[in-house]
UniProtKB/Swiss-Prot annotation:
One GO biological process term: protein glycosylation
Annotated organism of origin: Rattus norvegicus (Rat)
Official protein name in the record: Beta-galactoside alpha-2,6-sialyltransferase 2
Reactions it catalyzes: a beta-D-galactoside + CMP-N-acetyl-beta-neuraminate = an N-acetyl-alpha-neuraminyl-(2->6)-beta-D-galactosyl derivative + CMP + H(+)
GO cellular component, one term: Golgi apparatus
Pfam families assigned to the protein according to its UniProt record, in alphabetical order: Glyco_transf_29 (PF00777)
Region entry Disordered, spans: 85-107, 145-183
Residue spans, topological domain Cytoplasmic: 1-11
Positions bearing carbohydrate: N303, N333, N521
Disulphide bonds in the chain: C249-C515, C292-C444, C462-C473
Length: 525
């Protein structure tokens, strides 16, 4: 019996050894798999909900998104690797000049943009340093639980984990001596943007070359798509080197807020003249407003405690469906003007005609039109049908000031952005935020803009009132948001402290500017 028992034991040991090898092989296989490989389910979710429409009616304008639910496939445990938060922004460590050396995006020809299309990306920027690990295909699933002024809540690290993750160790600083000290205020910066990149954004030294490859692809897609038929002549490159005061004076000379007045075809033939308000938008406050606030809907405004400061202004502009109830401490409760895109009017879920959100305020609507500003073509085929709801609202509330911005005004703003940017920008209209800023600069002596350029509370939460995360909401894909913000940064007359801690930019109103008088050259001898 002993030889048989010994043989049986040997077989058992051999079987255990084989199973051990098999388990080890499986373990090595999964641990060596590439965690940065794209996850199709994640990207398809982002394509459908966050950034770029593919065509026509699926266009997404910032501020009009429906509140989405996060897909089950995006598990929080897959967002982090080795305890490190996935920073979606390139920090450009080691060479602070690298990010500035973006090549001029203009072609040799005088015109660009021909035909159209679009895609979307989940995260705006990607790191090249090993210290920052970005999981491709994952949107910014950062847990939105911050203390006052964007500081992490007790028990959290200053670089937050995904939802439900335990406390993680802080990331190592990438060659701290290579960047100014302000870039490493680790106790103040939130998690979804690298210290170095946010500092560069405050300084206006970022470019599209730092964008995540997918977002760059989305931008190229829109440039080739050119839905609105943009044909722009570059007119030289000196404009991109204008100083802030020079740019302000140029904008004062060219920017004229214009709305539909019912005098142009096809509206004149449709009886719109008595329908539109008798007093033009630019003349509602003939003496001008002293101080105005433009409140962005960015998620970064949460936990800011800016509500009292915002309400102290003479007038407050808000966007689309952004509420105040329940958010008064951070955003205030005063609303004077509300800029709304055409989706707000056309989508029944917004209850535009009956909602109290759109009552007792000045309403200013807009819709993308062809670059040619052909009103007949626009009326026949708007991006979203805002004309019928506009008529219904005017008939029901004839005394409420309600205007539709003229397409020429919208595209005039786009021209100014492109002329003052060395790179090609997306051939799509500016964002509602940029439009609102320019409208208020024409009406107010001083404009305070909150969280257009992000503060230390920067987060991937798109809007403070919607549970939807996407880093692209900060830099855009459909709208040329990156270039808009760089231009506004050049105009800022406020302090760096306000920009960093409040996300506040201060802009002078056009009426307060003292610009040199341009005299025509005397050709007489």
């Amino acid at each position: 019996m002993k030889p048989h028992l010994k043989q049986w034991r040997q077989r058992m040991l051999f079987a255990i050894f084989v199973w051990g090898l098999l388990f080890l092989a499986i373990f090595i296989y999964f641990t060596n798999s590439n965690p940065a490989a794209p996850m199709p389910s994640s990207f398809s979710f982002l394509e459908s909900r966050g950034l770029l429409p593919v065509q026509g009616k699926q266009r997404v304008i910032m501020g009009a998104l429906q509140e989405p639910s996060l897909p089950r496939s995006l598990e929080p445990s897959k967002v982090l690797m080795d305890g490190h938060s996935a920073s979606p922004f390139n920090s450009w460590p080691g060479d602070p000049q690298k990010g500035d050396q973006a090549q001029d995006g203009f072609d040799n020809g005088d015109e660009f943009f021909t035909s159209q299309v679009g895609r979307k990306s989940q995260s705006a920027f990607y790191p090249e340093e090993d210290n920052y690990f970005f999981v491709a295909g994952q949107p910014g699933l950062y847990h939105h639980r911050q203390g006052a002024l964007g500081l992490p809540s007790p028990g959290e690290s200053s670089w937050q984990s995904g939802p439900g993750q335990p406390k993680q160790e802080k990331l190592r600083h990438p060659r701290r001596g290579s960047l100014p000290e302000e870039a490493y205020d680790s106790d103040m910066l939130s998690t979804s943007m690298s210290r170095a990149f946010l500092y560069r954004l405050w300084k206006g030294t970022v470019s599209s070359k730092m964008l995540n490859p997918r977002l760059q692809k989305a931008m190229r897609y829109y440039m080739s798509f050119n839905k609105h038929g943009v044909r722009f002549s570059r007119r030289g490159r000196r404009e991109a080197r204008r100083t802030g005061p020079e740019l302000l004076c140029e904008m004062r000379k060219r920017v004229r807020v214009r709305t539909l007045d019912g005098k142009e075809a096809p509206f004149s033939g449709l009886g719109w003249r008595p329908l539109v308000p008798g007093v033009p938008l630019s003349q509602l406050h003939p003496r001008g407003l002293r101080s105005c606030a433009v409140v962005m809907s960015a998620g970064a405004i949460l936990n800011s405690s800016l509500g009292e400061e915002i309400d102290s202004h003479d007038a407050v502009l808000r966007f689309n469906s952004a509420p105040t109830r329940g958010y008064e401490k951070d955003v205030g409760n005063k609303t004077t003007v509300r800029i709304i895109n055409s989706q707000i009017l056309a989508n029944p879920s917004h209850h535009f005609i009956d909602s109290s959100l759109y009552k007792d305020v000045i309403l200013v609507a807009w819709d993308p039109a062809p670059y040619s500003a052909n009103l007949n073509l626009w009326y026949k085929k708007p991006d979203y049908n805002l004309f019928t709801p506009y008529i219904q609202h005017r008939l029901k509330y004839p005394t409420q000031p309600f205007y539709i911005l003229h397409p020429k005004f919208i595209w005039q703003l786009w021209d100014i952005i492109q002329e003052n940017t060395r790179e090609k920008i997306q051939p799509n209209p500016p964002s509602s935020g940029f439009i609102g800023i320019l409208v208020m600069m024409s009406m107010c002596q001083e404009v305070h803009v909150y969280e257009y350029i992000p503060s230390v509370r920067q987060t991937e939460l798109c809007h403070y009132h919607e549970l939807y995360y996407d880093a692209a909401c900060t830099l855009g894909a459909y709208h040329p948001l990156l270039y808009e913000k760089l231009l506004v940064q050049r105009l800022n007359t406020g302090t760096q402290a306000d920009l960093h801690h409040k996300g506040k930019v201060v802009l002078p109103g056009f009426q307060t500017l003292r610009c040199p008088v341009t005299r025509p050259n005397n050709t007489n001898t």
